[in-house]
C-alpha cells in the first residue's frame, strides 16, 4: 500500500501498518491496529481494529480474538489497488498549493518526487514535482453489508517522507462517517514492514484465496504475505475476520503461527496458507478450488520471493 511506484511487476508482496491518521483540524492519533497485506497483483486486504481506550472494559483483550465484540471493528475491506496518473506541476506551484489547504505534517522528500531538469507546464523552470496517486477499489467492505450499498471512493496522493525510506504519507479526502455526506481532508502515515522467512521455508511465501458466491451473498478473501495472514468474509450481512502472525509467543518457545485477532463466529481456513497447508502444495494450481464445508475458495494467486 505504501509503494510509490507504478503497479509492481515483481513477485514481492507488501506488508504495511499505519502509524497514525490525522483528520483536518485535529491532531494525529492512532486509535486502531491497522494492517494491510498486498499481493503482487495489487489484491489487498486492509483490517482496522480499535485498540482499547480508558473506558474499555478491563476484561477485553488488546485485540478482539474470541469472535467479538464487533464494535472493536473500525473498518475492514479488500479489493484491488491501482496507480493513477500522477499530479505533475512546477515544484514551486505544487508546494504553494499543498500548503494552502493541507500542509504535510511531516517533512516531504521532494528529491524523490522532483525532476529538477524538467520544464513545467507553460515552459516554467525550477523543476517539476510528480506526486504518485493511488486508488483502492473496494470489492468487500465492512461498511457496505446491506444490499445496494456502494463503497465510497478511496484514493490519495502518496508522498515520500524525508529521512524515513520505509514511510509514506497519504493525503486525501473521504467521509469520516459513511453516509454523512461530510467529506474531510485526512493524512495517514504508513510504514512498510520487513517480510520474514517462516519455518523451514527458503523463500518468503504468499498466496491469495478468494470466494464469490452470489447465491449466498458471500464474498471473501484470504491473503498471506510472509509472516502475516488476514482473512475477511462477508456472507448474508455477517462479517468474519481473522488475523494471524508467525511469532514467538513466549520466551524460550519456538515461533509458530498464532491467531492474534478474530471477529465473527465462523472459523476461516487461514491455516491452508501456512507451511504445508492445503493451498501451498506444489500440486495446487492457481485456479484450483478448495472446499471449506459449503464454501469454495479459489486459489487466485501464488507468489514467492
Question: What kind of feature is each model-predicted range?
Answer:
Residues 1-76, 88-305:
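Lipid interaction determinants
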Residues 76-82:
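Beta-propeller blade signature
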Amino acid at each position: 500500500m505504501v509503494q510509490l511506484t507504478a503497479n509492481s511487476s515483481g513477485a514481492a508482496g507488501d506488508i504495511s501498518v499505519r502509524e497514525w491518521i490525522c483528520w483536518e483540524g485535529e491532531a494525529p492519533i492512532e486509535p486502531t491496529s491497522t494492517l494491510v497485506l498486498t499481493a503482487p497483483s495489487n489484491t489487498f486486504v486492509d483490517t482496522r481494529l480499535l485498540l482499547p481506550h480508558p473506558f474499555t472494559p478491563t476484561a477485553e483483550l488488546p485485540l478482539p480474538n474470541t469472535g467479538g465484540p464487533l464494535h472493536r471493528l473500525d473498518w475492514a475491506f479488500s479489493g484491488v489497488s491501482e496507480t493513477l496518473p500522477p499530479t505533475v506541476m512546477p515544484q514551486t506551484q505544487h508546494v504553494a498549493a499543498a500548503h494552502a489547504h493541507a500542509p504535510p505534517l511531516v517533512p516531504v522528500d521532494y528529491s524523490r518526487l522532483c525532476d529538477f531538469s524538467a520544464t513545467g507546464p507553460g515552459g516554467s523552470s525550477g523543476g517539476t514535482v510528480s506526486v504518485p496517486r493511488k486508488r483502492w477499489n473496494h470489492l468487500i467492505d465492512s461498511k457496505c453489508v446491506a444490499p445496494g450499498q456502494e463503497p465510497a471512493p478511496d484514493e490519495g496522493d502518496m508522498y515520500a517522507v524525508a529521512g524515513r525510506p520505509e514511510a509514506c504519507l497519504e493525503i486525501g479526502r473521504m467521509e469520516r462517517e459513511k453516509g454523512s455526506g461530510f467529506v474531510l481532508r485526512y493524512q495517514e502515515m504508513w510504514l512498510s514492514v520487513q517480510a520474514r522467512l517462516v519455518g523451514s521455508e527458503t523463500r518468503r511465501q504468499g498466496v491469495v484465496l478468494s470466494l464469490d458466491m452470489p447465491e449466498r451473498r458471500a464474498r471473501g478473501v484470504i491473503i498471506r504475505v510472509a509472516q502475516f495472514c488476514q482473512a475477511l468474509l462477508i456472507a448474508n450481512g455477517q462479517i468474519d475476520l481473522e488475523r494471524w502472525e508467525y511469532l514467538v509467543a513466549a520466551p524460550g518457545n519456538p515461533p509458530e503461527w498464532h491467531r492474534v485477532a478474530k471477529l465473527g463466529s465462523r472459523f476461516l481456513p487461514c491455516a491452508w496458507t501456512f507451511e504445508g497447508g492445503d493451498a501451498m502444495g506444489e500440486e495446487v494450481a492457481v485456479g484450483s478450488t478448495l472446499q471449506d464445508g459449503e464454501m469454495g475458495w479459489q486459489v487466485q494467486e501464488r507468489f514467492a520471493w
